[in-house]
Amino acid sequence: MNTLEEVDESTHIFNALMSLMRKFLFRVLCVGPIPTNISFIMDGNRRFAKKHNLIGLDAGHRAGFISVKYILQYCKEIGVPYVTLHAFGMDNFKRGPEEVKCVMDLMLEKVELAIDQAVSGNMNGVRIIFAGDLDSLNEHFRAATKKLMELTEENRDLIVVVCVAYSTSLEIVHAVRKSCVRKCTNGDDLVLLELSDVEECMYTSIVPVPDLVIRTGGGDRLSNFMTWQTSRSLLHRTEALWPELGLWHLVWAILKFQRMQDYLTKKKKLD
């Protein structure tokens, strides 16, 4: 057996052991309540690139996409049915035009890769939904996101909402306008506009409100991300930058959610 074959066998054994360890860990974790929807504010890609002297405007974001892959895998194995990702907010468009183009090109690259995987049946039961002001994005990107959503719409193992060109402020304006148009179209009285009418027209109305919001990079803000929907959610912050987020960070956040369950339940009842 040559050296390369030995390395391949060792890697295979290591991966198998890690998989068994995760299954055992997740089985223990599932004794307690599991969040229905976990939202991630993925902060720290640029700082990660600077910290590790990575070259290229998209270097940190490429590292961040690796974390997305693993975090989604862990959530699926745990049994979390919904995940919401703050991928690119409206405020991010205020960055330099070169960086914005670089990041959007990278996102398009990953969307097209996911399309290829969906066509070949390798999405592992994951459904992708894009939410935000998609009309503000270029036609090529919109067409790609639409195709990926169509290809994965029957998948149910894990539903992932990717928020692009998104902010809560924009979402509320959109929802109020859409609900008013609905009322007028149906001949209803606008005075009778209900809270539920607005919430039904939110970009993210297709999924439950988040139970747990995880923010990386040490920040305490929600950054205009789902502030309407997270009034009863647990916010967990971690100093880890997004590309550094791993299995144990996720497990610790869920354990914190489980410890706070009584408080969160009482808060929901009071509201």
Curated annotation (Swiss-Prot):
Membrane topology of this protein: Single-pass membrane protein
Location in or out of the cell: Endoplasmic reticulum membrane
PROSITE patterns: UPP_SYNTHASE
TM region positions: 24-41
Gene Ontology BP annotations: protein glycosylation
GO CC terms: endoplasmic reticulum membrane
GO terms for MF: transferase activity, transferring alkyl or aryl (other than methyl) groups
UniProt entry keywords in alphabetical sequence: Endoplasmic reticulum, Membrane, Transferase, Transmembrane, Transmembrane helix
EC class: transferase
The protein's Enzyme Commission number: 2.5.1.-
Chief location of this protein within or outside the cell: endoplasmic reticulum
UniProt key word Aminoacyl-tRNA synthetase: no
Pathway: Protein modification; protein glycosylation
Cofactor (UniProt): Mg(2+)
Cross-referenced InterPro entries: UPP_synth-like, UPP_synth-like_CS, UPP_synth-like_sf
NCBIfam families recorded: uppS (TIGR00055)
Protein family per UniProt: Belongs to the UPP synthase family.
Function per UniProt: Catalyzes cis-prenyl chain elongation to produce the polyprenyl backbone of dolichol, a glycosyl carrier-lipid required for the biosynthesis of several classes of glycoprotein.
Annotated protein name in UniProt: Dehydrodolichyl diphosphate synthase 7
